[in-house]
Regions:
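N-terminal intrinsically disordered, low-complexity tails enriched in polar/charged
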Residues: 1-10, 67-68, 478-487, 763-765
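Second RecA-like catalytic domain
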Residues: 316, 364-664
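Intrinsic-disorder/low-complexity coil detector
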Residues: 23-24, 34-35, 207, 220, ...
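P-loop NTPase motor module signature
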Residues: 1-445, 605, 609
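Solvent-exposed, charged interface segments at domain starts and junctions
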Residues: 73, 134, 229-230, 239-241, ...
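Residue-level detector of short coil/turn "hinge" positions at structural boundaries
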Residues: 309, 422-423, 550, 723, ...
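C-terminal accessory domains/tails appended to large, multi-domain proteins
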Residues: 47-48, 55, 67, 71, ...
Length: 765
C-alpha cells in the first residue's frame, strides 16, 4: 500500500499554478535591497498584534519603560548583542520597538510594512527596513531563505507560545540572527539562555500604594455573580472584567448578569467575536458600571479602560501531549496567567479588587513568574514539513523543547506515503501543498480538486469546525447537508454572503465583506460572526494563491455537491479517518454531539482528543461521511502472502491478501494451499518449519521431540554455552533441512522430524 499511495500523489507533477503570496515576489530584488545593518523583522503572535505594532512604531510617547530604562535599551540596541525585556501591562514594551529599530538601523526613517494573511508581500516589500509578520509568515520566510544572519529579530509577546513561534526561534538560531525579545511577566531564565541574551531588562508599572484587595473564593462563576455582588458593582460604579476559560462560559456569564441586573452595561468577548463588539471598552467610552466577560485567551492582548475589578476562574483547558496526541485537558491556572490577569488592576488602579474563584488555597502574595509552557512537542508534522522545505534533518535544529522522535518518524512516514516528501525533501507536489495558506490536509484537497469544487474547499479550509462556528443554541434549518459537517459549514457561509455580503477590498485586496445586518442574521442562526469573517479572509487568500478571481456569489451545497466532495475525499483522504467509531490505531472515537454525521460508517475529518472525567484520553470527530462504495473503490489489495494460521480448523497454510484503505483493513481473502507451487515451495517449507518450531503445526513428531529439545537446552545452560545452542532459529533451521523435498501439506504431516541429542551433546557428557 505504501508504494501505491505515494505513486498516486506523485502523479500530481504539474499542479495548478500556485504562488505563495506572502513571500517577497522578487527574491533577488529583496536580497539586493538589504540595508548594510540588515532589516528589523518583528514577529507578532496575531494579525491584530501586527496592527498594534505598526501603530506603535509611528508613535513617540512617554512610557514607564522609556523613563526607567530608555538609555539602557538604546545602549543594548546599539551593541549588536541580543537581549530581552520583561515588562508588565502598561509599561510600554511594544512602544519600545521604535527606538530599538531606529538605533539598529541608524536612521529615524523607518519604512514599515506588514505581511500577514490580510496583507501580502508586494513589489514595495524590498524597500521596507522594518517588516512586521505573524509567526506563520516568519516560518515561511525562513523556509524561503528570505531572513538572513544580518537581520535582527524582535519577538513581541514571546510568552504567547505556539508551535509556529517555537519553530521560528529554532530557525532564527540556525540562520544566526540576533534576537531581541519582549515578554509579559514570566520567568525569563529559559529565553535568556536559549537565545543567548546578554541581559534582561525587567520593568513594572506596579505601584505598591495601589495594591488590590485579593480574595480566594471557592464558588462557580455563575454562583459568584449573584445579586449581592452585582448590587455592589452597581452601587460603586465599578468596571468588572470576568475571565473564564470557555466561549460558552463567557456567554452564559454575560447573559446571567444582564438578566439579573439590566442596568449594568454587559458585554462579552472571545475568539469567535469581532473586536468591534467591545470597542467602547477599549476606547474608554463605555460608562460604568459594566461587566465585561472574556476568555482568558481573548483578553491577553487587550487593554480595557476603566477596569478596577477582575474575577478570575482558576480553570484552563490546555493540550497535553500523551503518546504523540494533543489531549485537551482541564487544569488549574498557572502563576503566569493569574499574575497577568490580576495585574490589570493590582498595583495599577486605586481601590482595585481581585477575586480568584478556586478550590485551591492560593497564597497570591507568594506567586512568582514561572517558565513558559511550550507547544511544539505536539506538532511533529509541522517540524517535518519545515525540515523538508529546508532540506535539513530535525537534529540540525536547536528546538526549544525535545522532539518526540516516535511522533516525528510517524509524521515523516505519513508525508512520504502521501508523496509530499521524498529523500528528506519536498517533492513538486509537496511544494505546491506548502505554498498554500492553509493546513496541509486542505492544501492537498485544493491541489487535487477540480475547479467546480474549489469554492467549497476554499471556504471550509478557513473554518475551524462547524462546532466552533456555531453557538450551543443554533438554527441551521435549510443549511444542513446530511452527513457533512464541512458542507454544512460552507452553506452557513454561503447564506451569510447571499443575505448580508458583498465583494469589497481590504488593504487593496478583494475580499467578501458583510454589512451590519450580519449581526442580526448571526443572532438568529446562532452563528459566530468572527468565524464568517475569518472564512472570508481565508477564502480570499486561497483564491489569490491559486491565481483565480474571487467569486462574487456562491452556490449552495446540495446532494450532488456532497457526492463530488465525498469522491474527492475518498480519492485523496488527507484527513483523520474513523470507521464504525474506530481509529486507524484501534482506538475509539465518538462522533461529536454537534455533528450532522451518523455514528456508523466512515467519517473523514479532524480527530480531537480530550481528557475524560477520570483523565483518560477520549476522541471525537466531525467531518464528512464517505459511502462504503467509495471506500471500496479506492481501497488497495496487498500482494498475497503465504501464512500459517494455527487457529483455522482446516487448511492452516493459506495464501492471504488484504483489502486496505488508508490504514484500515477492510477484508481478507484466503486461499488454502495444499500442494506447493514450485514458486512457493521453499517459502512454504520455511513457514511450516517455523510453525513446527513454535509447536503450532499439527505434526505427529513435534511432541515426541520435547524431551530431546529440553535435554539439549539444559546441557547448553549447564555448559555455559560450550555445547551447541538449540534456540528457536536453530530448531526451525533443523526442521527446514528435514523438510527438503516436501511439496504438500500432507507430506509435511507425515514427514519425520527428529531431534537427536547426540548431534548436540556427545554421549560421554
Amino acid at each position: 500500500m505504501r508504494g501505491r499511495l505515494s505513486d498516486i500523489f506523485r502523479e500530481v507533477t504539474t499542479p495548478r499554478a500556485i504562488q505563495d503570496r506572502y513571500l517577497p515576489p522578487d527574491r533577488e530584488a529583496f536580497a539586493a535591497a538589504e540595508p548594510p545593518t540588515g532589516r528589523v523583522i518583528v514577529i507578532a503572535p496575531t494579525r491584530a498584534a501586527c496592527e498594534t505594532i505598526e501603530l506603535a512604531v509611528g508613535l513617540h510617547l512617554d512610557t514607564v519603560l522609556q523613563r526607567e530604562h530608555g538609555a539602557q535599551i538604546q545602549e543594548l540596541a546599539a551593541s549588536g548583542v541580543g537581549f530581552g525585556i520583561v515588562a508588565g501591562t502598561g509599561t510600554g514594551k511594544t512602544l519600545a520597538i521604535r527606538p530599538i529599530a531606529e538605533t539598529i538601523l541608524h536612521t529615524t526613517d523607518l519604512r514599515v510594512g506588514v505581511v500577514n494573511r490580510e496583507r501580502e508581500a508586494t513589489p514595495e516589500t524590498p524597500t521596507w527596513n522594518v517588516i512586521i509578520v505573524t509567526t506563520g509568515i516568519a516560518r515561511r520566510w525562513f523556509q524561503d531563505n528570505d531572513i538572513r544572519a544580518t537581520d535582527t529579530l524582535i519577538v513581541d509577546e514571546i510568552h504567547q507560545t505556539s508551535a509556529e513561534l517555537e519553530l521560528c526561534l529554532a530557525l532564527g538560531k540556525r540562520v544566526g540572527c540576533r534576537y531581541i525579545w519582549l515578554s509579559a511577566t514570566v520567568d525569563p531564565a529559559f529565553y535568556a539562555e536559549y537565545l543567548g541574551s546578554s541581559s534582561v531588562i525587567e520593568s513594572s508599572a506596579f505601584d505598591p500604594a495601589k495594591a488590590a484587595t485579593v480574595k480566594i473564593v471557592n464558588r462557580d462563576p455563575l454562583e459568584f455573580l449573584d445579586d449581592k455582588f452585582l448590587r455592589a458593582v452597581f452601587k460603586d460604579k465599578r468596571g468588572v472584567g470576568v475571565f473564564l476559560p470557555t466561549r460558552a462560559g463567557v456567554e452564559q456569564a454575560a447573559e446571567s448578569v444582564h438578566a439579573s441586573f439590566p442596568r449594568i452595561n454587559t458585554a462579552f468577548y472571545h475568539g469567535g467575536e469581532p473586536i468591534r463588539v467591545i470597542r467602547p471598552f477599549l476606547e474608554g467610552t463605555e460608562k460604568k458600571p459594566y461587566v465585561l466577560a472574556m476568555t482568558a485567551a481573548g483578553q491577553s492582548a487587550l487593554n480595557v479602560r476603566g477596569l478596577d475589578t477582575v474575577v478570575i476562574d482558576d480553570t484552563r483547558f490546555t493540550n497535553i501531549i500523551e503518546r504523540g496526541k494533543n489531549v485537551l485537558s482541564k487544569l488549574h491556572l498557572g502563576s503566569n496567567e493569574i499574575l497577568q490577569m490580576a495585574g490589570r488592576v493590582h498595583g495599577r488602579v486605586d481601590g482595585g479588587r481581585v477575586f480568584i474563584l478556586s478550590d485551591r488555597d492560593i497564597d497570591f502574595k507568594s506567586l512568582q513568574p514561572t517558565a513558559p509552557e511550550f507547544q511544539l512537542a505536539g506538532d511533529s508534522e509541522r517540524v517535518a514539513l519545515t525540515c523538508a522545505a529546508l532540506g535539513v534533518r530535525a537534529d540540525d535544529l536547536d528546538l526549544p523543547v525535545p522532539l518526540d522522535r516516535v511522533s516525528y518518524r510517524k509524521a515523516l512516514a505519513l508525508l512520504d506515503d502521501r508523496g509530499i516528501v521524498e529523500s528528506g525533501k519536498l517533492t513538486t507536489y509537496g511544494r505546491a501543498v506548502e505554498a498554500l495558506p492553509v493546513d496541509r490536509p486542505w492544501a492537498e484537497l485544493l491541489v487535487n480538486a477540480d475547479d467546480d469544487l474549489v469554492p467549497f474547499v476554499a471556504v471550509v479550509s478557513g473554518i475551524e469546525s462547524l462546532h466552533r462556528m456555531t453557538r450551543e443554541e443554533r438554527d441551521l434549518e435549510g443549511l444542513v447537508v446530511p452527513g457533512s459537517d464541512h458542507l454544512t459549514a460552507y452553506n452557513v457561509y454561503a447564506e451569510a454572503l447571499s443575505k448580508c455580503g458583498y465583494t469589497g477590498e481590504v488593504y487593496g485586496l478583494p475580499r467578501h465583506q458583510f454589512d451590519e445586518s450580519v449581526m442580526e442574521w448571526a443572532e438568529r442562526r446562532g452563528v459566530l460572526v468572527k468565524s464568517i469573517e475569518d472564512a472570508a479572509l481565508g477564502m480570499a487568500s486561497v483564491y489569490r494563491s491559486l491565481g483565480m478571481p474571487l467569486p462574487a456569489k456562491l452556490p449552495f451545497a446540495r446532494e450532488h455537491t456532497r457526492k463530488q466532495f465525498a469522491e474527492l475525499l475518498a480519492r485523496t483522504m488527507p484527513f483523520d479517518l474513523v470507521i464504525d467509531e474506530q481509529t486507524r490505531d484501534g482506538g475509539n472515537a465518538r462522533v461529536s454531539k454537534t455533528s450532522v454525521c451518523g455514528s456508523w460508517g466512515a467519517i473523514a475529518g479532524s480527530l480531537r482528543y480530550f481528557a475524560g472525567k477520570s483523565g483518560e484520553p477520549r476522541a471525537g470527530i466531525e467531518g464528512t461521511q464517505i459511502p462504503d462504495d467509495l471506500i471500496r473503490k479506492y481501497a488497495t489489495r496487498t500482494k498475497p502472502q503465504l501464512v500459517y494460521d494455527p487457529h483455522r480448523k482446516h487448511d492452516q497454510l493459506v495464501l492471504m491478501s488484504r483489502v486496505e484503505y488508508f490504514g484500515f483493513e477492510l477484508d481478507r481473502e484466503i486461499e488454502p494451499v495444499r500442494e506447493f507451487p514450485e514458486s512457493l515451495a521453499a517459502e512454504a517449507r520455511h513457514i511450516l518449519a517455523q510453525a513446527a518450531a513454535r509447536e503450532e503445526a499439527r505434526q505427529v513428531w513435534i511432541k515426541k521431540n520435547h524431551a530431546a529439545i529440553s535435554a539439549v537446552r539444559e546441557a547448553y545452560r549447564r555448559s555455559g554455552g560450550a555445547t551447541p545452542r538449540l534456540g528457536f532459529d536453530e530448531l526451525a533451521a533443523l526442521y527446514e533441512r528435514q523438510l527438503a523435498g516436501v511439496n504438500s501439506v500432507e507430506e509435511f504431516r507425515n514427514a519425520r522430524l527428529t531431534v537427536n541429542t547426540d548431534d548436540f551433546v556427545p554421549p560421554e557428557e
